[in-house]
Structures are given as C-alpha cells and as structure tokens.
Amino acid sequence: MKATLLLLCLACSALAAPPTKKQPEPAKPLPPLEKATIAIDGHPESVAADAEGNIYFTCIGAKLAPTEKDKDGYLGVIPHGSTEPKKITDVDTLDAPKGLLYQDGFLYCTDVDMVYKIDAKTGTIEGYVDLSPSRMKFLNDLAFINGRLMVSSTDTDQIFYVDTNTSSYGELVTKQPIYKPNGLAWDPERKVIYLCEYATDEKGKPSGRLLSINPVSREVTELSKERGQYDGLVYRDNALYYSDWSKDKKPEAIRRLDLKTGRSAPAATGPIEGAADFIPVSYTHLRAHETLRHL
C-alpha cells in the first residue's frame, strides 16, 4: 500500500498589528502553499533533511500499526533532485519508526520503545537506547535540547533524555503534568523546550495544549488558550508551527503562533489532509509531510 508524501513551503512572514492584552485577535492567513506529492510505500510519519537537500523519512509500514513490533517499518530517502524514494534500512530492521532527526551523517529515530542511531548512507545501526523497562509503546518525537537528545513518550505522558552512545536514558520530570506529549522543539534564545500535546478530554474533545518547559526549573507554561490534537512542532523565528489532527482537511490543520504577540493564524489558505511532522529547510521556509492519504 502506498501513501503520499506532501512537501509544503510555508512563508514565514511577520504578523502585523499587536494583540490586545486580554484576547489576541486572529492573525491574517499566510500566503498560499506551494506543494508537491511523492508516492511512498506504506505510512510515512516524519521527515528530516541534510545540508545537501536529501529528504529522509520514517515509514511505520504497510499497515498502520504504530505500537506493534512487526518488523514492517523502514527509513527511506528522497535524494536531492529526485522524486524517487529509496529505502535505507534492510527488511526486518525496524518495527514502526516515527520521530526522525538528522545530524552529522546519522539519523536518529524512535521505534515503539527504542531509539536508534543509524548511518544515513548505509542504514547500519550504530547505537540504540532500549526504553522498554519504562513500559511505553509510543515513543514519538525527538529533538536536540541544549545538546542533549530528548524524546516524547505519548502513551505514558513522559519526556526522556537519551544517549545512544552509552545506551542510557533518564526522565525529565516536570512540576506540572503533561498529557500525551508529541512534538518537541528547542528555543536556544529563551532556553526553553516547546511541546505540543495530542490529547482529548473525557468526552473525546480535543484538549491538547501548546507548552513551554524550563529544563532547569521544570516549570510548565501554557502558550495559548487554543486546544487541539497536536502532532508536528517547529520553532522558527520567534514563532511555532504546529499541526492539528482535530482540524484535518482544513486550512487550520497547520497553524503559526507568534510568540511575541500571542496571535495565531492558519499557515495555509486551502485544506490540508493528514499533516503531521515538519522540517526547516532554509531561513524562510519549512517543509512538512502529509501522511495517510492512500493511493
């Protein structure tokens, strides 16, 4: 089975008028998206890029089973200048890889209850961390936070520091609870972690929040009164870009929150289906991918 990988270019233009103190007014939508789709075998989840413009992606597998250890998943690459995806990892290597990062020739990915460090050219596993003793089944996003690799555990409401060189890990215990943590990002100026939640309340209504976490004090701060089922998260130029499954097939599926004004706006003028993860590809652009649109 195939799904499509959607590449989106989002203009990061500044927002205009300042907000009111009590209730920020909605900002104007950003310019239209430029997009192109590429067919992928299976269910793509996250994307990453290197300096040469190669686009890497994780694929959960032919069936959408993100918590099963079925050896059905893989890592792939779309070489720069090509529209033909290629598999990097061998069959029976990965189960359901989700979060993905590229750094210094290596790909870091989450896979159910594992975190792997994989050679981006050969697909060889160069290091790993086994988090199964903590009994999670849904390790999700990754981010380098102040030089340390961190991962979100969506099903256990936790965030972990991991070290693929020593195969060790530890939990970042926050002072206030977090629920269904998903996307992670680091703000090097403010020295805070950004987090979005994929959560619902007892009635099934979207209740996920956009948060900042001080890694030293462990204090959690809400950034917006908006609620959703958030997935991908990127910090860029004093703004957060985030995807929302509760707004699937709408322009609001991807939004931009200006951290200076507190105002948010749709990052698209047309409907977007299945938007999940994002990657920055230049100073003024982002790329995102669309998952679960079957051919």
Task: Name each model feature, range by range.
Residues 33-37, 84-90, 126-131, 168-174, ...:
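A short beta-strand motif characteristic of beta-propeller blades
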Residues 37-65, 69-71:
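Beta-strand-rich domains and repeat architectures in extracellular enzymes and scaffolds
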Residues 66-71, 154-155, 201-207, 247-251:
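Short, solvent-exposed loop/turn segments at conserved positions within beta-propeller repeat blades
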Residues 73-76, 114-116, 158-160, 209-211, ...:
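A short loop-to-beta-strand structural motif that recurs across blades of beta-propeller domains
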Residues 56-58, 109, 151, 195, ...:
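Residue position within the beta-strands of beta-propeller blades
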Residues 41-52, 91-104, 133-150, 177-192, ...:
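Beta-rich, blade/repeat-based domains predominating
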